[in-house]
Amino acid sequence: ERLTKRYVELVIVADHRMFTKYNGNLKKIRKWIYQIVNTINEIYIPLNIRVALVRLEIWSNGDLIDVTSAANVTLKSFGNWRVTNLLRRKSHDNAQLLTAIDLDEETLGLAPLGTMCDPKLSIGIVQDHSPINLLVAVTMAHELGHNLGMVHDENRCHCSTPACVMCAVLRQRPSYEFSDCSLNHYRTFIINYNPQCILNEPLQTDIISPPVCGNELLEVGEECDCGSPRTCRDPCCDAATCKLHSWVECESGECCQQCKFTSAGNVCRPARSECDIAESCTGQSADCPTDDFHRNGKPCLHNFGYCYNGNCPIMYHQCYALWGSNVTVAPDACFDINQSGNNSFYCRKENGVNIPCAQEDVKCGRLFCNVNDFLCRHKYSDDGMVDHGTKCADGKVCKNRQCVDVTTAYKSTSGFSQI
């Protein structure tokens, strides 16, 4: 089945050798890196991952860590610097160091395995090893693949080209495609580690690379971005322009269907009890109106309870929720135990001290139920107390663990009537 859409908020750091390699031309370096990110994004679309560049740092005044040709040593320093420096300045999911140094042992890149979202280890190092942008982009996509749990392809792994992205050796004609093995490794990583940081969609204003219509990232100046006209599945979006069609009224919401407002009168939030009011679409908005309910204190469930914030709390339902079927509310004698203040039998706690219930408040403390043939069953946890708003006597409800007159309980203290 199709994987959930995920977003990698990426920071790329170009070291000082990159700065000198491109003769200090920042515009040229930026353009080179934007091109790399666009390619990485295309490579990851089949995995339903979008890669958003949220920061680009060029070490124009000198390296901020010791960059050496020993890739593993440099990578470790970069991870430490990310924790103590970069993450404090800019929230992001993954950082890649792009270096113009010649890494040892024919290494073109290095990254730890399955570390996405880890503060120190969600990193990679990539050598700017070729004048062909695609080759550098595939290398960075490969290292990012390691962070996402993908190991090198073996002979039994296949994609539609001779060598796939996670091939151990980069070919001169590299592949855009992940193998079946890589896809399985990524799925396993997501299931086992469930990395949270790549679930949130980046803000338009966080993406620093120039907007690209069709990359499925919502960027500044775009109203929508559903991919290429061939793959777009959003009927509201014109894939060619990344603008909404002129007839579109809405894109999403409880009162939005097929890009139009749902007609007035369609229920969008059913009443959850006789104390709640069903809300219907207005025909003018994609949002369901604010949740409204009947006034607090209105009798409900054949006078067994009084409405409280859209519900009708009664002791029987609370007993049922705690103990299941074959329950009844315990006799009054059980509730009298709440006058003791011992153990869990009280109305309130003040500074850790149990305050016993007054005689008239006993049905607002610990809840007692008869379960099968057991009398006075109770739970010691907080959910074993009688709920606020529960009827405790005729014309009375529990408020602040006291059994008070229903008209007093719900009288507005601000002088305004309650909505």
Curated annotation (Swiss-Prot):
Catalytic activity: Cleavage of 3-Asn-|-Gln-4, 5-His-|-Leu-6, 10-His-|-Leu-11, 14-Ala-|-Leu-15 and 16-Tyr-|-Leu-17 in insulin B chain. Removes C-terminal Leu from small peptides
Tissue-wise expression: Expressed by the venom gland.
Keyword Glycoprotein: yes
Active-site residues from the entry: E143
Primary location group: secreted
Reported cofactor(s): Zn(2+)
Subcellular location: Secreted
Function summary: Snake venom zinc metalloproteinase-disintegrin that causes hemorrhage by provoking the degradation of the sub-endothelial matrix proteins (fibronectin, laminin, type IV collagen, nidogen, and gelatins) and disturbances in platelet function. The recombinant cysteine-rich domain interacts with the alpha-2/beta-1 integrin (ITGA2/ITGB1) (collagen receptor), and inhibits the platelet aggregation induced by collagen.
Additional notes on this entry: Negative results: the recombinant cysteine-rich domain does not inhibit ADP-induced platelet aggregation as well as convulxin-induced platelet aggregation, demonstrating no activity on the other collagen receptor GPVI (GP6).
Assembly description: Monomer.
Descriptive protein name: Zinc metalloproteinase-disintegrin-like atrolysin-A
Species, as recorded: Crotalus atrox (Western diamondback rattlesnake)
